[in-house]
From Swiss-Prot:
This is Large ribosomal subunit protein uL2. Residues 40-59, 223-274 are annotated as: Disordered. One of its GO terms (molecular function) is transferase activity. Belongs to the universal ribosomal protein uL2 family. It comes from the Bacteria. Part of the 50S ribosomal subunit. Forms a bridge to the 30S subunit in the 70S ribosome. The keyword S-adenosyl-L-methionine does not apply. One of the primary rRNA binding proteins. Required for association of the 30S and 50S subunits to form the 70S ribosome, for tRNA binding and peptide bond formation. It has been suggested to have peptidyltransferase activity; this is somewhat controversial. Makes several contacts with the 16S rRNA in the 70S ribosome. Coiled coil: none annotated. It holds the Pfam family Ribosomal_L2.
Length: 274
């Protein structure tokens, strides 16, 4: 893994900084583990925009990634590492001894030929998966389930990880990157190590077109709109909006708490720092 700054042969390449990983597979993905992906451009069945800033972008197939890691007690081996256009992390193609192949998130330090195992008790090596009850306190993990058997939901992006802080009865305490400490049942599974491609955040796309290739459309400021389109719109000449920053639907956007799931609030031991 290396960061490469391109030569300024054009204005669009002057500020490009990209990551290069020579270990990645250069061919097509495993055909049995891909699905056709349809893009809606952010529109619903009526053709109206329901998700702003979406549309265009390069066509891509969806890679079926195994977040549940429920193939238990069957050893596997990393066959190859691959690029995935649908996420910031790289993925690893695992070939199990029974012949089945699955994609998993590529952990930091994982390389071709490494053994991988998902079981109730496994060696503490990057890529191995086990319930939180068997992971030593202080370990760094990723792809953590929030409900047993549902599949990993926490720490799945490039370079992400959480730390197992303590275990009390049926619950473990995990410290997230945001500083939040959360209680999760010890039957939930997690993968050892942190997610690979940790230099993803240091890249620079260099031009607006590279963002459009990824299916992201421009963001228009509210103060540049008309009053019918945004609460900040209108006014004679350039104005500051005349009110505290809000979304197009009038909800405060800076510092306003929007979390409404009181049912799981008791699972949060310490809030993230604001």
């Amino acid at each position: 893994m290396a960061l490469i700054k391109t030569k300024p042969t054009s204005a669009g390449r002057r500020f490009v900084v990209k990551t290069i990983d020579t270990r990645l597979h250069k061919g097509n993905p495993h055909s049995a583990l891909v699905e056709v992906q349809s893009h809606s451009g952010g529109r619903n069945n009526l053709g109206r925009v329901t998700r702003r800033h979406q549309g265009g972008g390069h066509k891509s197939h969806y890679r079926l990634v195994d977040f549940k890691r429920n193939k238990l007690d069957i050893p596997g081996k990393v066959e190859r590492l691959e690029y995935d256009p649908n996420r910031s992390a790289h993925i690893a193609l695992i070939c199990y001894v029974d012949g089945e192949r699955r994609y998993i998130l590529a952990a930091k330090g994982m390389s071709v030929g490494d053994p991988v195992l998902s079981a109730e008790q496994t060696p503490i090596k990057p890529g191995n998966c086990m319930p939180l009850r068997g992971i030593p306190v202080g370990s760094v993990v990723h792809n953590v389930e929030m409900r047993p058997g549902k599949g990993g939901q926490i720490a799945r992006s490039a370079g992400a990880s959480v730390q197992l802080m303590a275990r009390e009865g049926d619950y473990a305490q995990l410290r997230l990157r945001s500083g939040e400490v959360r209680r999760i049942h010890v039957s939930c599974r997690a993968t050892i190590g942190e997610v690979g491609n940790e230099e993803h955040g240091s890249r620079q796309l260099g031009k607006a077109g590279a963002t459009r290739w990824r299916g992201v459309r421009p963001t228009v400021r509210g103060v540049a709109m008309n009053p019918v389109d945004h609460p900040h719109g209108g006014g004679e000449g350039r104005t500051s909006g005349g009110r505290h920053p809000v979304s197009p639907w009038g909800q405060p956007t800076k510092g306003y708490r929007t979390r409404r799931n009181k049912r799981t609030s008791n699972m949060i031991v310490r809030r993230r720092s604001r």
